[in-house]
Amino acid sequence: MIKIKNLVFRYRNSSNNALDDLTLWIPKGKYVAILGHNGSGKSTLSKILVGLFKPTSGEVEIDGVVLNQESKNLIQSKVGIILQNPDNQFIGATVEDDIAFGLENKMLKSEKIKEIIDFYSEKVGMKEFLKREPQNLSGGQKQRVAIASVLALDPEVIIFDEVTSMLDPLGKHSILELIKDIQEKNSKTLISITHDMDEAIQADYCLVFSAGKLVASGKPADILNNKEIVELAKIDSPFIYKISQKLEGIEPTYDEEHLLEQICK
């Protein structure tokens, strides 16, 4: 479980708090989407959770461990993050080297490392690219490698920070399917930082940020149907929902099957 209490963060030379007295909790094993406009504080929170930023004040607790300078390494072993631009995460000369990097730091035997690399590269559909240089991959392929590298370390919490924002529709769909697969087959706590409701719609529930504050929480459908919150957080409605809104006699829905059922009645 992740507990955040009275969290404040202010960037140097800024007169406003990026996170302003934020209190929330995220249950273990749930998929949570954090929504909000640019500058709402959602990505700042993700960087605090992985120990990259130190809070101005307040408390962060992950799995019973309070985040501080002494516990930072332990917390970082529990939390993995995939960034918006995976190029910022690549270390190895090849896909294989990149997935292996964190495993080598765990002092695992080479046979075990090879086994883990094979398993997770196949899981994300990148096994045939193991000898490829990361910079020669497409955006979607790079994100898959970044996800494999994090999964290989077996963290308890995985944060996806705007992972689809730079991808084309095909790449975006591919990554969302992969996240859905991780959600269904693993007991991980997943946190998706996004402003895209297409990404958030498959979460168990959503947290909505605006100006560094938590302004709403609830199931994706409830958030989507709250026009005030949608406008405040500048949330972009899913494509299916936009279509259903324009069809006369159709109840707005984000579910494609439900929309087809209504049309065919």
From Swiss-Prot:
Gene Ontology cellular component terms for the protein in this record = ATP-binding cassette (ABC) transporter complex
Q: Cross-referenced InterPro entries, in alphabetical order? A: AAA+_ATPase, ABC_transporter-like_ATP-bd, ABC_transporter-like_CS, ABC_transpr_CbiO/EcfA_su, ECF_ABC_transporter_ATP-bd, EcfA_1, P-loop_NTPase
What keywords sit in the KW lines?
A: ATP-binding, Cell membrane, Membrane, Nucleotide-binding, Translocase, Transport
Residue limits of the ABC transporter domain?
2-236
- Topological category with respect to the lipid bilayer: Peripheral membrane protein
Report the CDD domains cross-referenced here.
Answer: ABC_cobalt_CbiO_domain1 (cd03225)
What is its subcellular localisation?
Cell membrane
Please tell me which top-level EC class this enzyme sits in: translocase
| Pfam families the record matches | ABC_tran (PF00005)
Q: Return the similarity comment.
A: Belongs to the ABC transporter superfamily. Energy-coupling factor EcfA family.
Question: NCBIfam families attached here?
Answer: ECF_ATPase_1 (TIGR04520), PRK13648.1 (NF010167)
Q: How does it assemble?
A: Forms a stable energy-coupling factor (ECF) transporter complex composed of 2 membrane-embedded substrate-binding proteins (S component), 2 ATP-binding proteins (A component) and 2 transmembrane proteins (T component).
Name of this chain's protein: Energy-coupling factor transporter ATP-binding protein EcfA1
What is the scientific name of the source organism?
Answer: Mycoplasmopsis pulmonis (strain UAB CTIP)
What is the primary gene name for this protein?
A: ecfA1
